[in-house]
């Protein structure tokens, strides 16, 4: 095998060639096309959709950053909490199994959560436009489970936030059900300084991990 020169290695790095080949191989493994060469040609013509995970602690600004990035890149924004809730309500075999855990007040296993997420990421809009998943995976077990399902993002962004700052942001959150608006008593107070409901955690579903 030929030894690559420094110039060649630099070129490969600048043009993201290793990532390109990795994505081609991942798509082939996922779709198992009958004619791989024709499949690769078609994939290159239509482009490889972006696949992004953004995770972080509560109060780290995931929702705001995800919306900004999704709008800029034109990818489908997928909230993990909404996917899990709607997945349970969809009536599929997987969702019915998840519902059996929820109805007993038990934690839905990570492998089952990853299957529900994979189903959503396999839908036509996400496949065509690419996707950005907000708030998933939430732990190492979920990361391993979703990888075993064949979902490997091109980019994983972790929003780091000190625990005391996370608590400060959550402590002062308020939600007004009359206007369906969220406020922060220090940074973005409601008109008149009053708001009926205090929200101390994101609405992501306590029954899911």
Swiss-Prot record:
ATP binds at residues 59-64, 173. InterPro entries: Adenylat/UMP-CMP_kin, P-loop_NTPase. It comes from the Eukaryota. Its EC number is 2.7.4.3. Transmembrane segments: none annotated. It is found in: Cytoplasm. Keywords: ATP-binding, Cytoplasm, Kinase, Nucleotide-binding, Transferase. Catalyzes the reversible transfer of the terminal phosphate group between ATP and AMP. Plays an important role in cellular energy homeostasis and in adenine nucleotide metabolism. Belongs to the adenylate kinase family. Monomer. This is Adenylate kinase.
